[in-house]
Amino acid sequence: MPALLTIVLVFAGPASPPVPPVIGSHETDPWCLQWRGTFDSGKPACSSTEIAVWSPKAKRLYLCGGPPGIVRLDWTDVASPRVDRTYEASGVTSVATHDGVVAACHGGAAPKEMGEVLLLDLDLQLLKRLPVGHGPDMLCFTPDGSRLIVANEGEPLPDGSDRPGSVSIIDLSQGPTNARCTDVTFDAPQFGIDALRKRGVLFPHPTRSAAEQLEPEYIAIEPDGSRAWVTLQENNAIAAIDLHAARVLDIFPLGTQAFASAGGGLDPSDKDGAARIQPWPVEGLLQPDSVGCFAAGGSLYLVTANEGESLADHSVRVKDLANRLDRAKPALDPSAFSDEASAGLRHARTVLSSDGLGRLEVCPLLGDDDGDGDYDRLVCFGGRSVALWKIGGSASVPTIERAWDSGSTMEREVLARTPSAFNADSEESPSMDKRSAKRGPEPEGLTIVEHGGRRLLCVGLERCGGVMMWDTSDPKAPVFAGYCSRRDPTASGPSAGDLAPEGLCVIPASSSPTGEPLLVVCNEFSGTVSLFAIEARR
């Protein structure tokens, strides 16, 4: 049975937290974020403020995360937000709204139970419950509100069983009380594990099926509502779903980030005593978390936040690869990591040192390209970037091609603007450089802002904090537009400010309490939600 759900009316919100400085912005940035206010849940470190959505109709913000489950915020006074209604539910992972309906999802009461979607009105009165797939992680409405799409991650359980991932399509055309659900699975013959693995889709377990191991994470809907694009983060892939036919069109591997390329690079060590971004002979699985979709110049584009995700039991430091192979022979192929093969970057001995690549976490399943038992390539987790993908092909046979990638901009800009936050840990301060050997800044949430005839991409950096921006009005040549952080990386507790940005959304000027477009940033670890005015300087 699902957890008991009740409605509670709350009249007072918690006090605002101390106000740390807003850092990172430069006067020369073409865009900036001006802080307007912050809601503090008073519940840090319990995922109480993960995802938020704005209802223009109710002029309220709906927030989900830890207890109580779903919160409605009255932000009429931006300096003093208050909770005016809650809905109690355990394990709520996502919330969405369209017109007069609020939708939320949560897992079953027991690990092997199916998940559930809750349909509520704007006052959080329950309208209907619908069973969906295992482990629903994210949901969103199609632009016209006729369908609700749910990504059911189906993560492995501690007992070793692996629940299948799926995508649920909920038909709302006859109203929420008459909603019907169709589950789209990944068990079609053309998506067998051998065929997908040959194309580059990552599967950590050789004996489990593709349907069990594919894990839907996040969804973007095309503007006409015909197709959904679903990230499969652990698999380093993205799936295209036909929403009318309720079927998987294709699954696309996303490839890697080449950190050895000119002008690229990363800081791979947390023990080198400094922030050092430079090219290294290593590739990064993109493994995006969130994804968005927009139309420009007659074409469709996807945008992905290439966060990365380590695989349980399949992550090892470079210096430990030889131990894992249980061999005295070097783990790295000398011919692949010689000075000549590495374009003079680093000798293999230096690569293995703790102030080189030695401490970087890599995927041992990848890199032995010739099958001789040593590694010809090193492949780590995460692209430390954001990327644009051009959608091509036809309606039933789509294609995607990477059109642009931000490369090492995230690490370089954070280092230049807020050096004490460089690759810091969101759960510890001060902690500069602590996440360098893992996945760096970990771009996670994103949103697209249409303002003043321009298109602004906002990306939250989960570990170091803050929001980085690009003007993508010309998707062929995005322009870095600015960075803003409300974190004090030298402080701890409430005075540290906003920690671990997760969900981002936009309040349009037409329904904004201040009459200007506002960016909402949910911060998972600090338990805070902050509002920023979005301003174009030129």
Annotate each language-model stretch with its function:
Residues 1-2, 6-8, 30, 342:
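Generic N-terminal initiation segments characterized by hydrophobic and/or small/turn-forming residues
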Residues 3-20:
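Bacterial Sec-dependent signal peptides at the C-terminal "C-region" and cleavage site
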Residues 17-538:
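Beta-sheet-rich non-transmembrane sensory/scaffold domains
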